[in-house]
């Protein structure tokens, strides 16, 4: 004989069908969401090595040309240095192949800025302006013969022009006439002018 269900309680088999249907729908929906999430994670595209975050790679210091004091192979104001993804990082290398790095393989080449120099030394220009500026030697050296001759004939504009030129050359405001930059020690004191125009490229932040 089957035991009687206590009075006042509904039998599980006699429970409302809506509750069972709701539980089943929730279970099925959760299963579909989990499968979709797993598929999204598994199907995530491997990033390019140049898109790695800071700290996920390390780049070598550029090799400096002793004569120009600029990175070797500087072309169009740009040079490239080798960068190595950290161990256990997987990304697409230079050839587009998905590679699991160990820390010793080159992942990508990072562009760095460099300057166009044409043989004009900053130290020489400052020295000429300080000691022979009243003769216009600094202006002759930088490729301004007319101003150099004028300073020579006026003894550096009575010294005032020599002082002004010394300040302008020391602050790297006046440079070579051909538009090139001074040869300055790569890790020395350099003046960098920053400006933003309508043509300035703003790189989109790819991660928070």
Swiss-Prot record:
Glycans are attached at residues 73, 76, 97, 198. May participate in amyloid-beta-induced apoptosis via its interaction with beta-APP42. The gene is Tm2d1. Interacts with APP beta-APP42 (amyloid-beta protein 42). Residues 1-37 form the signal peptide. One of its GO terms (cellular component) is plasma membrane. The keyword GTP-binding does not apply. This is TM2 domain-containing protein 1. Residues 119-167 form the TM2 domain.
């Amino acid at each position: 004989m089957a035991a009687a269900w206590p009075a006042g309680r509904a039998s599980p088999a006699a429970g409302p069908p809506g509750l069972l249907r709701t539980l089943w729908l929730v279970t099925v929906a959760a299963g579909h969401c989990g499968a979709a999430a797993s598929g999204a994670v598994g199907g995530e595209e491997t990033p390019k090595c140049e898109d790695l975050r800071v700290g996920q790679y390390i780049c070598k210091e550029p090799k400096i040309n002793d004569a120009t004091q600029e990175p070797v192979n500087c072309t169009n104001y740009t040079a490239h240095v080798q960068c190595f993804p950290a161990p256990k990082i997987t990304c697409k290398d230079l050839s587009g192949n998905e590679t699991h790095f160990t820390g010793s393989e080159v992942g990508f080449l990072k562009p760095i800025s460099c300057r166009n120099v044409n043989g004009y030394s900053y130290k020489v220009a400052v020295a000429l302006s300080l000691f022979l500026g009243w003769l216009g030697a600094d202006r002759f050296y930088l490729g301004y013969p007319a101003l150099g001759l004028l300073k020579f004939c006026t003894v550096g504009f009575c010294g005032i022009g020599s002082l002004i030129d010394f300040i302008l050359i020391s602050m790297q405001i006046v440079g070579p006439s051909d538009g090139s930059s001074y040869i300055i020690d790569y890790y020395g004191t350099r003046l960098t002018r920053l400006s933003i125009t309508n043509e300035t490229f703003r790189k989109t932040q790819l991660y928070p």
